[in-house]
Amino acid sequence: YTAKPKLDFPRIEKIHQLTGVPLVMHGGSGVSPEDYVEAIKRGVRKINYYTYMAREGTNAAKAYLKDHPDVIYYHDIACAARDAMKNDVEKAMSVFYGLKK
């Protein structure tokens, strides 16, 4: 992105009020934790979250390969990626749902 995303919170709230249906946020890359929370307060109920999680998995796989250059088992790399992705999703869920871990 060339600029930080700017969510139109009054519009989100108005759409939610007029339709009475839960809203879906497609593409949340670059959205701050505070803006996620505000969007949820205004009617967003589903957030398609992938890019940050995938990036964490990729970075973990790269780091694992760097630290273990002779690794021959894919599942070792996949486990490192999975663990990083799981950690990232847990952080996102704590923002989305206000969970304390």
Language-model features, listed with the residues they occupy:
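Short, hinge-like loop/turn segments at secondary-structure boundaries
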Residues: 8, 41-43, 64-67
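Active-site beta-loop-alpha junctions enriched in small/polar residues
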Residues: 26-30, 50-52
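Glycine-rich phosphate-binding active-site loops on the catalytic face of alpha/beta enzymes
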Residues: 42-59
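Extended, intrinsically disordered, low-complexity segments
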Residues: 63-101
